[in-house]
């Protein structure tokens, strides 16, 4: 099969470990980044992490700080304007998913290097060259800048709220069904499929399953495993040149819920819930996935997230239309109401 050329841009440096923010200055010197920097962060992270753990290591560099509160188009445009006005040469994203998305999208828009400094392991966006920016019509990921380097301090990540950590596990479990959907699209539609990239994504999912076995006993060890899984998943997307290895029917379901109920459930929670049902359709051992989720406290029912049963069914019936060009197990026509209800009930997502 003839494959269209795509350029694979991967992180050149990945720093991970306990307490490594103490080496922040050394990392910046090693990377030899052009200045001035634009540090993009959130209000809480600025106060609790940047001011206390990073600022002293960056004081000899030229930099500006901008605080963001949301990941939407208006916020992204505001940050882009600031970056252009200040003549910014390098973008540093210090925060969770919202901050990282804005940072790498800004870096992409102004064509600058991006350094990812995650403070919560809530999804695989810490590494991937894609960002979830609201206000673009549909809640899907768009092209962004891949990180030149990732600085992931496991001590900081392990101190994130447990719900965010669980969401990261949930997002990573979704690779189980995403890769199956990718294989299906290759078989039925002739879509490009990369064995190595798919294997990398599946390895991330296996790491997430391993994480569910240890994280209740040892949060640091569990988060270390999760962080490696999230990084691997992001790298898989970079190699594929798309989100295909990491996003399939389970993500389409999550995006459908996000459209119907914008403020209910974290992204990773919704992906995990979708993974249970899509695994059922694929004939994968969905009970194992559900047990792993339940063990760590991830929601396994619509009631736990606050979504009405009919909302789950509705999301299942419209999920295929979120990205019509992305073929999945849901097919071109999607699920009927009756089929969707049967799937949701038999997997225990609704009662």
From Swiss-Prot:
Query: Quick one: a GO biological-process term for this protein?
Result: phospholipid biosynthetic process
Single GO cellular component annotation? cytoplasm
Main subcellular localization, coarse class? cytoplasm
Pathway of action: Membrane lipid metabolism; glycerophospholipid metabolism
Q: How does it assemble?
A: Homodimer.
Could you tell me what this protein does?
Catalyzes the NAD(P)H-dependent reduction of dihydroxyacetonephosphate (DHAP or glycerone phosphate) to glycerol 1-phosphate (G1P). The G1P thus generated is used as the glycerophosphate backbone of phospholipids in the cellular membranes of Archaea.
| Family membership noted in the UniProt record | Belongs to the glycerol-1-phosphate dehydrogenase family.
Q: What is this protein called?
A: Glycerol-1-phosphate dehydrogenase [NAD(P)+]
Q: What organism is listed for this UniProt entry? A: Sulfolobus acidocaldarius (strain ATCC 33909 / DSM 639 / JCM 8929 / NBRC 15157 / NCIMB 11770)
Which gene is this protein's source? egsA
């Amino acid at each position: 099969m003839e494959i269209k050329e795509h350029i694979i841009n991967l992180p050149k440096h990945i720093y991970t470990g306990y307490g490594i923010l103490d080496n922040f200055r050394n990392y910046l010197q090693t990377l030899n980044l052009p200045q001035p920097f634009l540090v993009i962060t959130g209000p809480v992270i600025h106060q609790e992490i940047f001011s206390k753990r990073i600022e002293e290591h960056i004081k000899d560099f030229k930099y500006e700080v901008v605080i963001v509160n949301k990941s939407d188009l208006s916020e992204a445009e505001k940050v882009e304007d600031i970056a252009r006005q200040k003549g910014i040469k390098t973008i540093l994203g210090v925060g969770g998913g919202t901050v990282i998305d804005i940072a790498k999208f800004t870096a992409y828009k102004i064509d600058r290097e991006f350094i990812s400094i995650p403070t919560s392991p809530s999804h695989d966006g810490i590494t991937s060259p894609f960002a979830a920016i609201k206000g673009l019509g549909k809640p899907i990921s768009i092209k962004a800048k891949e990180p030149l380097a990732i600085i992931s301090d496991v001590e900081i990540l392990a101190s994130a709220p447990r719900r965010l950590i669980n969401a990261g596990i949930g997002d990573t479990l979704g690779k189980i069904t995403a890769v199956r959907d990718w294989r299906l699209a290759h078989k039925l539609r002739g879509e490009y499929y990369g064995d190595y990239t798919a294997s990398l994504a599946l390895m991330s999912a296996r790491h997430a399953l391993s994480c569910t076995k240890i994280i209740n006993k040892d949060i640091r060890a569990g988060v270390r495993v999760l962080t490696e899984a999230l990084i691997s998943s992001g790298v898989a997307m970079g190699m594929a040149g798309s989100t295909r290895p990491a996003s399939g029917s389970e993500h389409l379901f999550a995006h459908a819920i996000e459209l119907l109920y914008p403020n209910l459930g974290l992204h990773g929670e919704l992906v995990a819930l979708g993974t249970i049902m899509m695994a059922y359709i694929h004939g994968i051992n969905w009970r194992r996935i559900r047990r792993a989720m339940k063990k760590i406290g991830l929601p396994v029912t619509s009631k736990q997230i606050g979504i009405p049963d009919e909302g789950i069914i509705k999301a299942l019936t419209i999920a295929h239309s979120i990205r019509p060009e992305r073929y999945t197990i849901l097919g071109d026509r999607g699920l009927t109401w009756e089929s969707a209800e049967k799937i949701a009930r038999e997997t225990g997502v609704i009662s």
